[in-house]
């Protein structure tokens, strides 16, 4: 099951929080979902080169707050915050409501699965070899402190006539372990041969509650002592 479903959705309420945080009623449920989709689609298209790793939408009775977590927040803020003001006005025109925008910096950009997937996609669009792009992202994640990373690319790799899937795995990525903190990202590279899908899973460690023991692996298991030979009578 862990191999098939989205690892973020599988862990909601366990070690992952929702990215849309509000309580709906029957009257505004569809409207709120549509607004969240428009906000995310607009920001990802408008601020693609700022390296957005996460967009949080929070609603209260009268307020709508959007938090953008980006690797390069200076691109969004601009000189003296002028770009943020323009962005706020564009969002207000889009959904017809007052919006507060907060910009946060992604301190560990190398350990963000979404940024890693977008990095591979950008390199593929620049005609860099897919194996080289995958290995570069893996090295960056390991330097950022990731305990494991898996990168998968699917499509007409290298211009081949038949589409295929290639993937690399470094370290551990336990998709079936619900207490494992796993980040997931997806991006598409639009090449002359067609679209290439990029998926990235990054394992950041286990979230242990009181009384829980970490999962033992083959590397961490203690070595068995050699048996003593019995002496003859």
From Swiss-Prot:
One of the GO biological process terms: translation
Record-linked CDD domains: KH-II_30S_S3
Listed Basic and acidic residues bias regions: 212-222
Entry GO MF terms: mRNA binding; rRNA binding; structural constituent of ribosome
Keyword RNA-binding annotated: yes
KH type-2 domain mapped to chain residues: 39-107
Bias kind Basic residues: ranges: 224-233
Family: Belongs to the universal ribosomal protein uS3 family.
Function: Binds the lower part of the 30S subunit head. Binds mRNA in the 70S ribosome, positioning it for translation.
Protein name: Small ribosomal subunit protein uS3
Gene: rpsC
């Amino acid at each position: 099951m862990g191999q098939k479903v989205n690892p973020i959705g599988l862990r909601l309420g366990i070690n992952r929080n929702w990215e849309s945080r509000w309580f709906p009623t029957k009257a505004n449920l569809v409207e709120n979902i549509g607004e969240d989709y428009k906000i995310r689609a607009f920001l990802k298209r408008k601020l693609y080169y700022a390296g957005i790793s996460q967009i949080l939408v929070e609603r209260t009775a009268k307020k709508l707050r959007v938090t953008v977590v980006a690797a390069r927040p200076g691109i969004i803020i601009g000189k003296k915050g002028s770009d943020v003001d323009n962005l706020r006005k564009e969002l207000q025109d889009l959904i017809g409501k007052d919006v507060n925008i907060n910009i946060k910096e992604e301190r560990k950009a190398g350990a963000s699965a979404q940024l890693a997937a977008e990095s591979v996609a950008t390199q593929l669009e620049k005609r860099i070899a897919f194996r080289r792009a995958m290995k570069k992202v893996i090295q960056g994640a390991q330097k950022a402190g990731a305990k494991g990373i898996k990168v998968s690319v699917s499509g007409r790799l290298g211009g081949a006539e038949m589409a295929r899937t290639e993937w690399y795995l470094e370290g551990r990525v336990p998709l079936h372990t619900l207490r494992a903190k796993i980040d997931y990202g997806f991006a598409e590279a639009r090449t002359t041969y067609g679209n290439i899908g990029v998926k990235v899973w990054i394992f950041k460690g286990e979230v242990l509650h009181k009384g829980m023991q970490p999962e033992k692996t083959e590397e961490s298991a203690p070595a068995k002592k050699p048996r003593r030979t019995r002496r003859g009578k």
